Amino acid sequence: MAGVTNYQKQGAVQNTGDQLALFLKVFSGEVLTAFTRATQVMNNHMVKTIDSGKATSFPVMGRGKAHYLPAGANLDDLREAIPHNEVVINIDGLLTSDVLITDILEAMNHYDVRGEYAKQLGEALAISADGAMVAEIAKLVKANKENITGLGKGVVIEKTLTGGAGINYDTGKAVIEGLLEMKAKWTSQYVPENERFAYITPEVESALIASKDAINRDFGAVASIVDGNINKLCGFKIIAVPHLKAGGADKTGMLGTAPEGHVFPTEYAKALAVCAHRTAVATVKLKDLQLEHARRPELQADMIIAKNAVGHGGLRPEACGIILAK
């Protein structure tokens, strides 16, 4: 008997081509949704997309100066050139997260695993990206350098906590004081007052609520003890990041002869908050988040891969800061 050819191909577009095409789109959407929900930093910094190449540069300019021009004097004698510099951010390589789903185990399974796998693939890439960007903020502070003389360096504010950091009044009070000091320091370095972000752990967020001042309506705080979250404080948008100090993915496999990787500095292990303006760090995208499906007949399995090719780096040290417990 000849093989049946007129069966219904639910996953194929108009019954032709890839029989999994339509199924994959659903899975891809789930990965993208999971990535968007999990990332806490991606929308709060600069992103640049390139069509080709291994790196891109961001120009850095200093500040001009004003001079009084006496009668009969020449502007050429007073003019001071505005200093320039550049920051280069390299593509890190191809970052991947994948699953291998065998036919026999999927057939035996009594529940659907693909939805959860989609979530895990998206979250893996999101957490890696978040960790890398927060690490780059901290690395700019640790470097203690200026892009151009006079623009300013990263800010470290140390707060003494006798009993150690915890979900308590003292920790919350220390963070509020630290944010106020950071606000003053940044303003003195001409960091724009809008789009300032403070990344904290969930424990620090709870400590802020425990301090009461953060949710005190008399102080105009944008927070709620009912929901247990804080939106804005001292001019900073407050964002709780569970993986605050995790850093990026392991640097093994990154491009370059001796890549540094995106490792959160151990010196800041007691950081209460990592602060940054939107322009402090940047991501360069060569390949945005994509999903690839491959049939592995030799294994009788489906392989699903989420991937992107991006690079992360610091731009403006003067717009970075750490609030550190000691």
Whereabouts are the PLM-identified features?
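Extended, solvent-exposed, turn-rich assembly/linker loops in the middle of proteins
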Residues: 146-226
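Short, Φ-rich (hydrophobic/aromatic) sequence segments
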Residues: 18, 22-34, 178-183, 272-274, ...
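Glycine/small-residue-rich hydrophobic helix-like segments
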Residues: 227-293
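Long, contiguous amphipathic alpha-helices that act as assembly "spine/axial" helices in icosahedral shell
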Residues: 58-60, 83-149, 153, 187-202, ...
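Short helix/loop capping segments that flank catalytic or ligand/cofactor-binding pockets
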Residues: 66-69, 100, 109, 207-210, ...
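N-terminal "assembly arms/tails" that initiate or stabilize quaternary assembly
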Residues: 1-87, 320-324
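Extended, compositionally biased alpha-helical segments that mediate assembly or anchoring
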Residues: 2-8, 285-326
